Regions:
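Small-residue-enriched hydrophobic alpha-helices in membranes
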Residues: 1-8, 35-123
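Short terminal alpha-helical segments
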Residues: 4-37
Length: 123
């Protein structure tokens, strides 16, 4: 997988979809939609996991600790710039045990992506 700076146009829809897990909303309502976006992308599940942990999470995790967190979604331009400034591309993935909230959502999302892929294959 290319670094985000070299692959930004293809990453943007993924970044925009994945931000839901750090917004002040019920991400369960969008889980299927996000899984479908991810499944249709060119990225493998392991690449999507790296994007989730090392690109989107470092950019927006602050929001879950905010008293008046963003709930409508970050502006896509702002989000892209923020990710390009703070990403951890190429670094080891964080240990889920130390990040239970993000780990829980990744587990749910990866299961949903697998389900979407399985349904598409058998349709």
């Amino acid at each position: 997988m290319y670094p985000p700076e070299q692959d930004e146009p293809d990453r943007r829809p993924i970044w925009d979809a994945l931000q839901i897990f750090w917004l002040d909303t019920d991400a369960n309502l969008d889980l299927r939609r996000v899984a479908e976006i991810c499944e249709r992308s060119k990225y493998s599940l392991s690449e999507l996991e790296a994007i989730y942990w090392n690109e989107v999470r470092p950019a927006v995790r602050f929001n879950i600790f905010s008293l008046a967190g963003e709930w409508a979604g970050f502006d896509p331009e702002w989000l892209s710039k923020r990710i390009l400034n703070v990403h951890r591309f190429g670094e080891a993935l964080p240990r889920k045990v130390f990040h239970p909230y993000s780990g829980m959502w990744w587990d749910r999302l990866s299961s949903e992506i697998n389900q979407v892929e399985n349904e598409r294959r058998h349709a």
